[in-house]
Amino acid sequence: MDQILLFFISSLALTLMPGPDILFVINQSLEDKKSGFLVVLGLCTGLVIHTLIIVFGVSSLIQQNYVIIDFFKYFGTLYLFYLAFIELKKNNKLNIKVKENFYLRGVYMNLINPKVLLFFIAYFPNFLFSNTIPISYQFFILGSIFIGQALVIFSSVSLASNKLILLIDVDLKSKKIVFLKSFIFIVIGLTILI
């Protein structure tokens, strides 16, 4: 049980550290509460998929094949650059309607970042807590704990971001905000690439 508590505490600390997921949640929560929450659900769905990949042992194949890792890294960066472009385009003077699915954005954001899977592969084995429970079950339990705390933290960040924007009464369609949101997508893309 000490291992599980240590895992929980370290997971909280890691999730709270400013990184691509937190930036993504903040950026998408500027739209409205619903958009932010859908992104959070999408990110956590991606975490479920990463956990299942580890539980079923596919992770070792992916870890040994750097072509797959590089593909996701470059595809992820291009996707985020695309989101930056869409952000600029939807707020231009032509007023082009862009259909957005914030849930899928969250799922894609999590799945295209190979660092998440590699992190799980490196992180989870350090917190195995039983000699009698199969490792795959332990990975599932650890993944569930990680997803649960991420859901709470990401949701809190989303709500706080949205409340802050409402409190300071910012025009989300102003050129400065649009460029800032696009810039954040580019920064997240570059972080995945590095």
State each model region's role.
Residues 12, 16, 49, 85, ...:
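Hydrophobic/aromatic residues within the transmembrane alpha-helices of Major Facilitator Superfamily
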Residues 63-92, 153, 165-194:
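Selective transmembrane alpha-helices of multi-pass membrane proteins
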Residues 138-163:
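Hydrophobic alpha-helical transmembrane segments of multi-pass membrane transport proteins
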Residues 2-70, 122-142:
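Juxtamembrane transmembrane-helix termini in multi-pass membrane transport proteins
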Residues 51-56, 112-124, 184-194:
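Hydrophobic alpha-helical transmembrane segments in multi-pass integral membrane proteins
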Residues 89-102:
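Flexible cytoplasmic inter-helical loops of multi-pass small-molecule transporters
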Residues 46, 50-58, 80-83, 117, ...:
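Alpha-helical transmembrane segments and their lipid-water interface positions
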